[in-house]
Amino acid sequence: MRLKLATEHGLLTLLFLAHTSKSMTRRGDYVKTKDISFQCDISYEHLTKTVSILRKAGLLQTHAGREGGVELLPLSQTIRVGEVVALFEHPLVHPTTRYQLHALDQLCDAALISFFNTLNHTTIQQLADDLPPHFFFRTS
């Protein structure tokens, strides 16, 4: 199954924020979108779309201004990988054929359910915790 590039961007953004939130010591420390763009190798234009989708889904909050940026909301620590994939891939549909093959439709539906059940065994925070400390560390 091939996922959209936007899905990868959404997952990387959440992983980066979850990974870096451990090192943030003060409330009000926000991650700049330009930093996310650089460290995750996502174009700034694509990242702004990704951040907008994640904000509307209630997973992160944005703060405008010179000292602004992005922060994870507490709910994000428990969000499952499959939920993020579904957010960006919705609606997932199985391939259609020229023939009405009910058995094939059922098989594809079962495969999608299995796919999401597997992804939903892991949270974004669990993935972030398993990353090496300098996973997102890029220098110009």
Q: Language-model segments: what does each one mean?
A:
Residues 75-101:
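Conserved segment of winged-helix/HTH DNA-binding domains
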Residues 45:
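Key DNA-contact positions within bacterial/archaeal DNA-binding proteins
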Residues 38, 55-56:
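Alpha-helical residues within the helix-turn-helix
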Residues 3-42, 71:
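N-terminal helix-turn-helix DNA-binding core of bacterial DNA-binding proteins
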Residues 51-52:
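Short, hydrophobic-biased segments on the C-terminal half of alpha helices
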Residues 57-66, 71-72:
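Beta-hairpin "wing" of winged helix-turn-helix
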Residues 97-140:
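C-terminal regulatory/oligomerization modules of transcriptional regulators
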